[in-house]
């Protein structure tokens, strides 16, 4: 069991590095800073477009049921509850763990998901609500340890 979680941790670190590279590439292309992602729905959509295939590929390579990428930005800082609303993607396997199992979109652009044959689930929402993540603020505080030593296993979290 310990080996299984070690492998998941390594895959999580690799996913984080891959997604960070996608964000860096898109920001450099647009000559933007990360802070400028707020209130930039077209750029956030473009990021999700770039991230969805690598995210789905990584998910299919694992024995876990879902994978997500959360960006510390929102499409609309003026909407009610925006302080807890964050862009990103959450994709989940819809059934048995096979290489061709259909994937479902729980968070992210429905248009991006559909374009990649990842259909929105009935619980789909555009963005994550970070007030539903236990200890979210603590997880978002940069640590001094290397990424491969910074992961933590948490209790199962059910999306509303």
Please provide the spans of the model-predicted regions:
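Juxtamembrane extracytoplasmic/periplasmic/luminal helical "stalk" adjacent to the first N-terminal
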Residues: 1-46, 63-65
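Residue-level signal for functionally critical sites in structured catalytic/ligand-binding pockets
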Residues: 10, 51, 153
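Amphipathic alpha-helical segments that form well-ordered structural scaffolds
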Residues: 11-15, 54, 135-138
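Short regulatory alpha-helical segment in sensory/regulatory domains of signaling proteins that mediates
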Residues: 20, 52-62
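Well-ordered, non-membrane alpha-helical segments in soluble/globular domains
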Residues: 44-53, 132-134
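Extracellular/periplasmic ligand-sensing ectodomains of membrane signal-transduction proteins
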Residues: 58-160
């Amino acid at each position: 069991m310990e080996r299984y979680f070690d492998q998941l941790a390594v895959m999580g670190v690799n996913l984080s590095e891959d997604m960070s590279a996608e964000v860096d590439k898109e920001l450099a292309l647009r000559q933007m800073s990360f802070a400028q992602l707020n209130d930039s729905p077209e750029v956030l959509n473009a990021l999700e477009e770039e991230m969805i295939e690598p995210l789905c590929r990584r998910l299919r390579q694992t024995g876990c049921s879902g994978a997500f990428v959360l960006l510390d930005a929102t499409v609309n800082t003026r909407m009610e509850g925006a302080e807890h609303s964050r862009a990103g993607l959450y994709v989940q396997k819809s059934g048995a763990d096979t290489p061709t199992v259909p994937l479902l979109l729980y968070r992210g652009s429905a248009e991006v998901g559909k374009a990649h044959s990842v259909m929105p689930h009935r619980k789909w929402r555009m963005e994550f609500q970070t007030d539903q993540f236990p200890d979210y603020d603590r997880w978002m505080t940069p640590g001094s340890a290397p990424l491969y030593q910074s992961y933590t296993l948490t209790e199962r979290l059910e999306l509303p």
